[in-house]
Amino acid sequence: MKESIKLKLESLSDRYDELAALLGVAEVIMDQDLFRAYSKEYAELEPVVKCFNEFQQIDENIAEAELMMTDADPDIKEMGVEEYKAGLAQKEELQLVLQKLLLPKDPNDSRNVFLEVRAGTGGDEASIFSGDLFRMYSRYAETQRWKVEIVSASDGEHGGYKEVIARIVGEGAYSKLKFESGAHRVQRVPATESQGRIHTSACTVAVMPEMDEVDDIIINKSDLRIDTFRASGAGGQHVNKTDSAIRLTHIPTGVVVECQEERSQHKNRAKAMSLLASRLQAAELEKAASEQSETRKSLVGSGDRSERIRTYNYPQGRVTDHRINLTLYKLDEIVAGELDSLINPLVNEFQAEQLAALSGDN
């Protein structure tokens, strides 16, 4: 292990012990904000420190095995060789785990997300496919025990959506879904196709971390144009009685958001403000990523919504993620919400990129 990494781990271990002591101090316990901040930091450090302690114990075991290897008794010597080999293998494995734990954390990973799915090329079939994608993400959210709230939706003429925007609430939602942004392509025979020909359609997906307008991004009220209108769609007689739907226009950037799913204008406005903050933040992040990509192109994490990232081929039952050349012949399971078989390899690839960069920096 590099000396710089070892010193970093020792420093984190000292901080962990310090926090353990602080969390027992009466003044800290009385200060809820401070107690919460220390508790969060302590919880984040715990897996790193535990792994480092295990790593140090293995180092001690290896040293003991080396002593056994010098023993005159051949049985003890043989046992020492076996323990030495096992210790080295464990040490190498733990070293990789520790390096991953030390990778810079995305501050947005624990946030809720706004998910946008839009029909692209392909007409009605693209709208139907956008409905399939939204259902896929909704089912995946169920498996993660996340909550899905539709913010706005524009139905397709023959099913699905021209556009659907949803808020997904749950721990780690962004960390799991952030690599889904991009163009998703489908190849299949549409239900409306009488000749049995395979058509290609596409949808774009955008995943944005939910921003707290107050804490994360400042929006001047003077920069907003606020319009109210009557909600369309489900809702019974209520939709014809009040202008509960909200449209916000951010004048400096031209970004427009709508929310009409809640019956209360106040709730629609709050959701629209949150979505607007996330859109503005996403635009800033996209700009920064674009500038950064001129020096170093990230294979997985670019998040460019125009980039073709995945193809769903129904006749072959195949899903291909083009960023990491991963092909899985389990389309039915994936569109039913079993996304981890795609998400986990993407996360692993992204971490491998980070590790390579970390090695280069050191």
Curated annotation (Swiss-Prot):
Methylated by PrmC. Methylation increases the termination efficiency of RF1. GO terms for cellular component: cytoplasm. Keywords: Cytoplasm, Methylation, Protein biosynthesis. It is found in: Cytoplasm. InterPro entries: PCRF, Pep_chain_release_fac_I, Pep_chain_release_fac_I_sf, Prokaryotic/Mito_RF, RF-1. GO terms for molecular function: translation release factor activity, codon specific. The modification N5-methylglutamine is found at residue 237. It holds the Pfam family PCRF. SUPFAM superfamilies: Release factor. Peptide chain release factor 1 directs the termination of translation in response to the peptide chain termination codons UAG and UAA. Belongs to the prokaryotic/mitochondrial release factor family. HAMAP family: Rel_fac_1. This is Peptide chain release factor 1. It comes from Marinomonas sp. (strain MWYL1).
